[in-house]
């Protein structure tokens, strides 16, 4: 008699969808169904609702006990995809599908980036050549602890990459998000000095264009 396949559950979420600096990080964590109660008992939340210290503690515990995979898209790859008219939703569909393809779970819980959560799941399923159940939902990181786990690992990994960027640049680049004045100040200062944006910036972003426009305007005023 054939041995029954063990049910495996996968949660997937991303960090760094909106920033103008740094990569997009997608994490998939996979556990056996019997491990779900332990994940739930950890009291995980959406990574954005946790302190940095708590995120790092949870991430260390999760990585030590469960299998996970990361997909990291640097700014250059994001920009190249946009030049070929791929949008961010399509990029994430490909990343999510790649992680699912590698792990081949029985069920995958996804934090949908598309405004239509059902469509996001359908588009991912079209990329796969095997059957599985997909649960695609908005704010899945607040609804499903397995997705909260993926969210935490993705966020902690991206934060570490942003710290590396600051170290490489020799100054604080901030969080990388457009609303962060430290990030915008860094980009403007860099552009004024080098007449270009750094490699860590997503040059296809509207924020990048706005930074360049502001710098060019400032130069015009200097010569008036």
Swiss-Prot record:
Pfam families: RNase_HII. It comes from the Archaea. Keywords: Cytoplasm, Endonuclease, Hydrolase, Manganese, Metal-binding, Nuclease. It catalyses: Endonucleolytic cleavage to 5'-phosphomonoester. Its main location: cytoplasm. Its EC number is 3.1.26.4. HAMAP family: RNase_HII_A (MF_00052_A). This is Ribonuclease HII. It comes from Methanocella arvoryzae (strain DSM 22066 / NBRC 105507 / MRE50). The lineage of its organism: Archaea, Methanobacteriati, Methanobacteriota, Stenosarchaea group, Methanomicrobia.
